[in-house]
């Protein structure tokens, strides 16, 4: 049975939720098995969901025993839901079935995204058994900037500003597809991003970095080329420009997801990125 987690029950449930979050076979994304995020981070993030009007925390019980916790965000205006804690000890399929039914009743017609480690076979099997498509399979790479020493400045890479945003937009419109963060949304939230471009025409490339204030963990949201073809040296240049900027701003960790089997692996490995594991994303139409 799923029910809203009450504040008085938080301490009783959070220990189990964190224990499960440290097991990729019993948890979802974002993963806490990466050696970066801490128990304190997990507790703080989950507690924050209890206080936010656009987030909920549910507890999954069977026969009066707590078996898991699900926390998620629901963006009402966008009709979009996103799970950020999925810690289930057993009967994962039943928990997901109840969760999807709960969301479908409250937000019919919305989209629900669920991210999972490849190891969480129970969750993946239930979703796939319901015909839910896997929309992304990526390697989760992590870079520790604490020992990073920037080399010489990178030539040919240009930061994006309001003045040259259309250069960036000309690239991003060709690669954005159905992604939420399209040109229009990025432009409206320029303060939340760091953008770089390189090259021109079909060979032009872009890198999009999160820029959430003083957060010591940032993420590369996208790095690609206008014609969709991978080019190792421009890729390395864009990535290096991103690392230089993040080091300057005091960032400690950088996350970068790349397609499983993609050619980026060689450059990432040589630059010192560490592969945390495989990420799989599923999208449920409610």
Please place each PLM-identified region on the residue numbering.
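Short amphipathic alpha-helix that is part of the acyltransferase structural core
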Residues: 1-41, 138, 148-180
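Hydrophobic beta-strand segments of well-ordered beta-sheets in folded domains
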Residues: 3, 79-83, 108-115, 218, ...
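Alpha-helical elements of Rossmann-like donor-binding domains used by nucleotide-donor carbohydrate transfer enzymes
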Residues: 12-16, 98, 102, 167, ...
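Conserved donor-binding loop and adjoining core beta-sheet/short helix segment
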Residues: 28-94, 98, 203-230
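Cytosolic beta-strand hydrophobic patch enriched in CBS
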Residues: 57-61, 194-200, 256
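Generic helix N-cap/helix-start motif at coil->alpha-helix transitions
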Residues: 80, 182-183
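Acyl-donor-binding surface of acyltransferase catalytic domains
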Residues: 88-153, 238, 247, 253-286
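Glycine/small-residue-rich hydrophobic helix-like segments
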Residues: 183-244
């Amino acid at each position: 049975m799923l029910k809203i987690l009450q504040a008085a029950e938080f301490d009783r449930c959070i220990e189990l939720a964190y224990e499960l979050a440290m097991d990729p076979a019993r948890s979802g994304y974002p993963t806490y098995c990466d050696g970066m995020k801490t128990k304190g981070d997990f507790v703080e993030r989950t507690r924050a969901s209890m206080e936010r009007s656009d987030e909920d925390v549910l507890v999954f019980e069977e026969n009066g025993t707590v078996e898991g916790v699900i926390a998620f965000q629901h963006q009402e205006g966008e009709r979009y839901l996103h799970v950020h804690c999925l810690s289930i000890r057993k009967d994962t399929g039943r928990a997901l079935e109840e969760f999807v039914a709960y969301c479908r009743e409250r937000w019919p017609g919305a989209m629900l995204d669920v991210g999972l480690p490849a190891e969480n076979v129970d969750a993946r099997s239930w979703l796939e058994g319901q015909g839910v498509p896997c929309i992304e399979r990526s390697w989760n790479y992590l870079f520790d900037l604490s020992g990073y020493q920037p080399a010489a400045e990178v030539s040919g890479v240009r930061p994006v500003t309001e003045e040259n945003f259309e250069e960036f937009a000309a690239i991003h419109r060709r690669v954005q597809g159905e992604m939420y963060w399209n040109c229009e949304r990025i432009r409206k939230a320029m303060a939340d991003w760091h953008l770089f471009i390189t090259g021109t025409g079909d060979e032009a490339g872009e890198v999009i970095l999160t820029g959430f204030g003083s957060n010591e963990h940032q993420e590369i949201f996208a790095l690609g080329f206008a014609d969709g073809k991978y080019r190792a040296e421009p890729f390395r240049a864009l990535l290096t420009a991103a690392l230089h900027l993040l080091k300057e701003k005091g960032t400690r960790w950088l996350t970068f997801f790349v397609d499983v089997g993609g050619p980026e692996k060689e450059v990432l490995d040589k630059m010192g990125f560490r592969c945390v594991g495989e990420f799989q994303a599923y999208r449920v139409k409610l």
